[in-house]
Design a protein with these regions (language model features):
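N-terminal pre-domains immediately preceding structured catalytic cores
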Residues: 2-209
């Protein structure tokens, strides 16, 4: 009887050991697979969008090009002599619809100006702003459309509000973040909602004088 009990205990111990080893092996496999899957086949390269933007400060025009061919042009207002628009090539990665506006700190022209919320009267950004150089350089709309074609801004590129909305839609689509028309309908009809869109593929903007 004692011999039989001893054999049973040994068998139970052996079964427990085998089960423990099997579970340990499964746990190792579960940990290993995600680590391999996390990097396998991932492309971490930044892909630029197929269209490019080109702003010429002397002609006060902004062109949209694809493969060297101009597909759209817009008239813009550029920076005044005291507040020049930066020259160079920049990457557009962010667009804000119904943006709020805060007076740029340490800017003489912005003294005594008060912040404006999304869609608020007197908001100089209008319906959309397209970031091209941090912290405060954008392509945005203007209520003073008569200033287009002149050097009137504080460094940004100003456009007709309808034109800049058209441009922002195009940039979003080409940058891999398209939206349905009902999304834009909501933006236009609910002006107090600020929406930020980050592009999957940056769009290049080159500014020359």
């Amino acid at each position: 009887m004692k011999l039989e009990m001893t054999l049973k205990r040994k068998n139970l111990a052996l079964i427990a050991l085998i089960a423990s080893t099997a579970l340990s092996g499964c746990a190792s496999a579960q940990v290993g697979v995600p680590e391999q899957a996390a990097t396998a086949g991932r492309d971490t390269t930044t892909h630029m969008a197929p269209v490019t933007l080109h702003a010429d400060l002397s002609s006060k025009m902004l062109a949209v090009k694809r493969g060297g061919e101009t597909i759209k042009t817009y008239q813009v207002a550029v920076g005044q002599d005291r507040y020049p628009t930066p020259i160079g090539t920049f990457e557009i990665r962010r667009i804000v619809w119904n943006p709020s506006w805060h007076p740029p700190p340490n800017s003489e022209w912005a003294k005594n100006k008060t912040p404006k919320g999304p869609g608020e009267a007197g908001n100089p950004m209008k319906v959309v702003k397209i970031f091209f150089k941090d912290p405060d350089y954008y392509i945005h709309g203007t209520g003073d459309v008569e200033s287009l074609g002149s050097a009137a801004s504080h460094g940004c590129l100003r456009m007709d509000p309808d034109d800049v909305a058209d441009l922002a839609k195009l940039v979003m689509t080409e940058g891999g973040e398209p939206r349905e028309e009902n999304w834009f309908w909501r933006i236009i009809h609910f002006r107090r909602e600020e929406k930020t869109v980050y592009l999957d593929s940056p769009v290049s903007l080159t500014i020359t004088d």
